[in-house]
Amino acid sequence: MTTQVVNVIGAGLAGSEAAYQIAKRGVQVRLYEMRPVRQTPAHHTDKFAELVCSNSLRANTLTNAVGVIKEEMRLMDSVIIRAADECSVPAGGALAVDRHEFAAKVTEYVKNHPNVTVMNEEITEIPEGPTIIATGPLTSPDLSAQLKELTGEDYFYFYDAAAPIVEKDSIDMNKVYLKSRYDKGEAAYLNCPMTEEEFDRFYEALIAAETVPLKEFEKEIFFEGCMPVEVMASRGRQTLVFGPMKPVGLEDPKTGKTPYAVVQLRQDDAAGTLYNIVGFQTHLKWGPQKEVLQLIPGLENAEIVRYGVMHRNTFINSPNLLRPTYQYKQRDDLFFAGQMTGVEGYVESAASGLLAGINAARLVKGEEPIVLPPVTAMGSMANYITATNAKNFQPMNANFGLFAPLEKKIKKKAERNEAYATRALETIRNFVNI
């Protein structure tokens, strides 16, 4: 066993996954996490892998690229996906978790590994020796300054936004109905139907509601996957009806008709006592936020247990700075992982940590780091963030559009996606025992 130690900075999804992958390969890990010594504006606990935006890890089927990346990670013994599977709550065709159980489970698996030493302290300088930086969207100012000096690149700022959570007991169950879109999977969502008149009243209140002001030095760059609902609404009345409030596939069983608009609520905890408002990430002030949300049918008396908030996100210009192994181009033993690299989403962040962790372990053991082929979901993400146009680089979720093209063109989308998934999983099996 090598005597070298790998430093992993940050115990979010990427850092926790990286630490676990290194440790299971017989390499010692020092895992640095500044919480609870120093908190961030969005975190509330000292647990690893705390989910701050949503409790959903999104699609769990192989017809979706994020479902494929999860299955690849299962085959590669991902601690994040293992914990998620063990803490899942009903969510139709998606993988959603009880966020508290999930964080506790990840913390337990990583902390209890004999090769992991946890250091609860803030890192303000980049350490020497093998290191993975996985400090996430809320990297501390001191370390941010160090990273900016190291990379010579300006950081980009945008906001992830967290959706409100309400108590189930405060929902008027006579006005909502249980259903998943197109009846896929079990009926897992509470649906709040709106007439056109109700939608108009809601929309006018939403676009007039007061938001928390942004700091002057921060640019308003919103990533489409976590865009505040009021920003979507400002783009036009129909943006919501064709976005998070789209009613297609959600016929009201009481009327047999499709509502004008629908707000969906998704179970947020294993006990089924809390529900988050799907797609309603927001930066509204809390008073106006409550007034707007209580215009939704069924939520007139809703008890909001967590208001929607927004927080900064930070990422580097990976095409200029990183290799597809997640290594820094100017220093072989320095790796980056997580949202800082420009992979967007919980699962994608964890996947980058998995690959960075494997490669850090291989490096200290004198083995060649691996590059996963872009026919795999994980390989396509690594390829995207390192090979795309650096000038217009923006964060990206996993999607089949990033995969290497199929040898034969397939017209039907479902068959094409199935072919992408089959090829990806056949390929990833060659890397399972690395």
UniProtKB/Swiss-Prot annotation:
Keyword Acetylation: no
Cofactor: FAD
Catalytic reactions of this protein: uridine(54) in tRNA + (6R)-5,10-methylene-5,6,7,8-tetrahydrofolate + NADH + H(+) = 5-methyluridine(54) in tRNA + (6S)-5,6,7,8-tetrahydrofolate + NAD(+); uridine(54) in tRNA + (6R)-5,10-methylene-5,6,7,8-tetrahydrofolate + NADPH + H(+) = 5-methyluridine(54) in tRNA + (6S)-5,6,7,8-tetrahydrofolate + NADP(+)
Residues binding FAD: G10, A11, G12, L13, A14, G15
Record's subcellular location: Cytoplasm
Gene Ontology molecular-function annotations: flavin adenine dinucleotide binding; tRNA (uracil(54)-C5)-methyltransferase activity, 5,10-methylenetetrahydrofolate-dependent
Single GO cellular component term: cytosol
Main EC class the enzyme belongs to: transferase
InterPro entries in UniProt: FAD/NAD-bd_sf (IPR036188), MnmG-rel (IPR002218), MnmG-rel_CS (IPR020595), MnmG_N (IPR040131), TrmFO (IPR004417)
Entries under Pfam families matching the protein: GIDA
GO biological process, one term: tRNA wobble uridine modification
Organism superkingdom: Bacteria
Enzyme Commission number, as recorded: 2.1.1.74
Matching SUPFAM superfamilies: FAD/NAD(P)-binding domain
Keywords linked to the UniProt accession: Cytoplasm, FAD, Flavoprotein, Methyltransferase, NAD, NADP, Transferase, tRNA processing
Record family assignment: Belongs to the MnmG family. TrmFO subfamily.
HAMAP family: TrmFO
Protein function: Catalyzes the folate-dependent formation of 5-methyl-uridine at position 54 (M-5-U54) in all tRNAs.
Name the record gives this protein: Methylenetetrahydrofolate--tRNA-(uracil-5-)-methyltransferase TrmFO
Primary gene name: trmFO
